[in-house]
Amino acid sequence: MTEIRNNWTKEEIAEIYHTPLLDLVYRAATVHRENKDYAEVQISSLISIKTGGCPEDCAYCPQAARYNTGVDVHGMLPKEEVIAAAEKAKAGGASRLCMGAAWREVRDNRDFDKVIDMVKAVNALDMEVCCTLGMLNEAQAQRLADAGLYAYNHNLDTSEDDYKRIITTRTYDDRLQTLEHVRKAKITVCSGGIIGLGETVEDRISMLKTLSNLPKHPESVPINALVPVKGTPLANQPSVSVWDMVRMIATTRIIMPKTVVRLSAGRTEMSTVEQAFCFMAGANSLFAGEKLLTTPNPSFDTDMAMFDLLGLTPRKAFKNGRPQQEIMETETIL
């Protein structure tokens, strides 16, 4: 087993990131096989339970109210629609449902009550439940935990130095504080970032340093490639190279060997061969289904065909226990 470290330096991470690509993939694949069943990949499904109208100014996001992106704004979905989506996702091979709401932060109101009911209902389907709802306080995190929430997603997006170029309506420390509240409630942490925002390689390395130097590594780190959306400030950003994705995934796998590395947004632009490189580099989770909130994504059928071709198997839910059980870091997976 690989040693778990929480004291990585930027210089060490940079040296890993800049390793010749094939050597980097080989090293990451070796670490992956030492710590995980390399052929086992968790399938997650992501749905938007409240879309658009967000007061924040995230430069990449089509759900920000201040941008004219043509997003179909809607309020909270009925619980019945969420259950139906969860059942469809489970039938397609997903073991986790992530519910996203376009909020700046959680508020103690009827909508949050509805989220609690949704968490309980999806949990009853024997699926892991994840939420991404913006900032939340300790009491709200505990309420979600009591309802059976397995994971909470709150991405850092980019480095602390680059952050204000992308978002001004909440601080980097706000994000880190939310992660602390999630951890204190014994909910597993999902936090990663986006490449292709116009950041530098140093920004990518700095973000990975922040994540890997948390008191406990996130159980899941999503690596997203920007999907430019017309109407947002980043609409004209050039597409990021798939090899940059491979480097990010491989570096993440090496410095956080027991963390699940999720191949997230941007897969529609990747061939099966390119995605295979991502799995070789240590990715062991993906989002399946036609949409990731508001952006396109490969279908369940397409992904199942890829799994068959590559010899991958979907991971079952709750392999390491239910949300409120103490999860061993040596076996934790999202």
Identify what each model region corresponds to:
Residues A65-G192, L197-N213:
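Conserved Radical SAM active-site core
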Residues I47, L133, T171, G193-G196, ...:
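Glycine- and other small-residue-rich loops at beta-strand/loop junctions that grip anionic moieties
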Residues Q42-S48, N68-V71, C98-D111, D162-Y163, ...:
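Glycine-rich, proline-tolerant flexible connector loops at the mouths of alpha/beta enzymes
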Residues Y26-Y67, H74-G100:
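N-terminal pre-triad scaffold of radical SAM enzymes
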Residues V41-S45, L97, V129-C131, Y152-H154, ...:
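Hydrophobic faces of well-ordered beta-strands that scaffold small-molecule active sites
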Residues P20, C58, H154:
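Residue-level signature of catalytic and energy-coupling elements of molecular machines
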Residues M1-A39, A84, S212-L334:
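Auxiliary Fe-S-binding modules of radical SAM enzymes
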Residues A39-P55, A59-A65, I116-N123, M127-C131, ...:
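Mobile, glycine- and charge-enriched loop segments
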